[in-house]
């Protein structure tokens, strides 16, 4: 008789864990949706990749440079967007001691084709630990509508 409540409790616990696991996985993704656009992004040290938006020599010698890479998808069709212009404004972590490194930097993300896939990217300075806010202004070719998307990147050393 005592084992029946234990089995029910165990089943309830398994159901609870099963419901919470997908939410935790979604929190770790680097994907943001806004309007008609889904944005997938990644940030990696520039020394580990070919440099876009800068020379390879600069990327390999400067440990503070990171490469922001963005892939755009049309939410209604799921197809990759290949004809966009993206301007990014990167704001560094806030500092109470100094505002030197919090000055926003604006950059135009450059399109790069790898096979059939188009991504957009640029190098930026991420020398301080903390959360970087990256504001994207996305315009598709032939459209005047600008889609604004905010990405958050938590720089940890």
Spans of features found by a protein language model:
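Short amphipathic beta-strand segments in non-cytosolic proteins
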Residues: 87-108
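Surface-exposed edge beta-strand/loop patches
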Residues: 121-157
């Amino acid at each position: 008789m005592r084992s029946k409540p234990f089995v029910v409790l165990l089943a309830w616990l398994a159901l609870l864990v099963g419901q919470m696991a997908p939410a935790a996985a979604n929190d770790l993704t680097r994907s943001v949706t806004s309007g008609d656009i889904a944005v997938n992004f990644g940030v990696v040290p520039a020394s580990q990749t070919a440099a876009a938006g800068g020379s390879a020599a600069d990327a390999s010698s400067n440990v503070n440079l990171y490469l922001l890479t963005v892939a755009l998808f049309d939410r209604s069709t799921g197809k990759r967007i290949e004809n966009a212009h993206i301007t990014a404004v990167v704001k560094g972590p806030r500092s109470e001691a100094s505002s030197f490194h919090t000055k926003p930097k604006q950059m135009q993300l450059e399109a790069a084709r790898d096979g059939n896939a188009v991504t957009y990217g640029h190098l930026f300075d991420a020398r301080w630990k903390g959360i970087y806010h990256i504001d994207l202004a996305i315009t598709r070719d032939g459209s005047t509508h600008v889609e604004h998307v905010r990405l958050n990147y938590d720089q940890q050393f």
